[in-house]
């Protein structure tokens, strides 16, 4: 019995030794700084889940400007992606280059087994997307796409109501996205130079903001591909955007539902909201947190506030880290998934084709 106190002293040490050690932060490289959404990762509060180990950006002046703004060392900056990957050996790369450049990022990362998260949309066209998909599958990497609206609690509340059958079968989705225009809101020229060029972005507002609606409607419809696409684009401000559209409406037809995507650089204010109508009820996501719901037994809309998303489902880089570390399962039906975003690119390419020809385009595309 004299040894009992000593044994009791050892118990906490034994229990501590059995506990798994905390996982180290995921080593992340940043491919490009020319997409203004890069401030999301550069200005992110420290959460201990990722560590930026390198940045690939040939524009030294831009890198220095952002280094001063966010306080990172220029020692992290490399002139190109290949040199950054070789020197820093990241586990994952976040692509904030041009949309056209997403393929190049995957071509460099996939053979090295490096996971990739691109900023929306996945690819500039279906040809690029299919090459990226093939590389991701061949080398068994994650290929994720980030959208701001993925992290809106309001959108997830609407989806829950739809999935629970509270609204009845979905009949119509109306999704509004955009702002006054990238030049009007003061986007830097390193961003607008490629954003307003069809080669590097694939189009104008139809791509920049049409992708949100394509992503959300595919998610709400549980991965179902539309049967046809009809789109109309306009150049309301050709003096500002001579190469691309600044106004787009895309109609997605499903066997028993319809989605109307209103993508614009002409809204009088910035907006990312949607209306979902079921057979017997409706739910509107007004912004990131607010929504209003009309249930079958009600004659009016009831305002609601969505609960905040819990980690790691509240942040793109937390999600990326959790998937790389395999602390959460991969969901092929999610907003970030490759499966969803292959359909998104197909919708966008069909929309561009429809707008150019004035004809309805049927899916799947060849």
Describe each model-derived feature in a short phrase:
Residues 17-71:
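N-terminal Rossmann-like dinucleotide-binding module
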Residues 184, 272-343, 361:
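C-terminal glycine/acidic-rich active-site capping loop/insertion
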Residues 213-292, 318-328, 350-351, 364:
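Contiguous beta-strand/loop segments that form the cofactor/metal-binding neighborhood of enzyme cores
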Residues 131-149, 171:
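Rossmann-fold dehydrogenase core element
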Residues 10-17:
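Hydrophobic h-region of N-terminal signal peptides that target proteins for export
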Residues 36, 150-240, 358:
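Predominantly a Rossmann-like dinucleotide-binding segment in NAD(P)-dependent oxidoreductases
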Residues 62, 72-135:
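Beta-loop-alpha module in the N-terminal Rossmann-like domain of NAD(P)-dependent dehydrogenases
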Residues 19-22, 92-94, 322-366:
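C-terminal helix-rich "cap/oligomerization" subdomain common to oxidoreductases
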């Amino acid at each position: 019995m004299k040894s009992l106190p000593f044994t009791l002293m050892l118990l906490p040490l034994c229990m501590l030794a059995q506990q798994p050690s905390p996982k180290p932060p995921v080593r992340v490289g940043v491919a490009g700084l020319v997409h203004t959404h890069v401030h999301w990762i550069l200005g992110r509060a420290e959460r201990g889940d990722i560590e930026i180990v390198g940045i690939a950006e040939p524009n030294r002046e831009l890198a220095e400007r952002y280094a001063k703004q966010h306080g990172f060392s220029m020692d992290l900056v490399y002139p190109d992606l290949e040199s950054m990957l070789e020197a820093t050996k990241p586990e994952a790369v976040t692509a904030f280059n041009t949309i056209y450049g997403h393929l190049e990022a995957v071509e460099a990362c996939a053979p090295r087994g490096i996971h990739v998260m691109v900023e929306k949309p996945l690819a500039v066209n279906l040809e690029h997307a299919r090459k990226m998909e093939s590389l991701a599958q061949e080398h068994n990497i994650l290929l994720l796409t980030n959208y701001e609206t993925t992290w809106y609690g309001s959108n997830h509340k609407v989806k829950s109501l739809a999935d629970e059958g509270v609204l009845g079968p979905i009949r119509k989705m109306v999704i509004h996205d955009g702002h006054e225009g990238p030049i009007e809101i003061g986007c830097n020229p390193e961003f607008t130079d490629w954003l307003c060029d069809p080669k590097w972005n694939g189009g104008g507002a139809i791509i920049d903001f049409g992708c949100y609606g394509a992503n959300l409607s595919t998610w709400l419809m549980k991965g179902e591909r539309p049967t046809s696409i009809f789109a109309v684009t306009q150049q309301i401000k050709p003096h500002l955007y001579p190469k691309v559209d600044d106004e787009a409406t895309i109609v997605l037809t499903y066997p028993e539902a319809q989605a109307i995507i209103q993508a614009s650089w002409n809204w009088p204010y910035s907006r990312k909201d949607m209306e979902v109508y079921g057979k017997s009820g409706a739910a509107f996501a007004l912004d990131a947190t607010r929504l209003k719901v009309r249930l079958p037994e009600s004659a009016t809309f009831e305002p609601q506030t969505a609960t905040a998303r819990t980690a790691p489902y509240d942040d793109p880089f937390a999600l990326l880290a959790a998937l790389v570390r395999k602390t959460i399962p991969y969901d092929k039906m999610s907003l970030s998934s490759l499966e969803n975003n292959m359909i998104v690119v197909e919708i966008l390419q069909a929309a561009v084709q429809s707008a150019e020809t004035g004809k309805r385009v049927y899916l799947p595309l060849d």
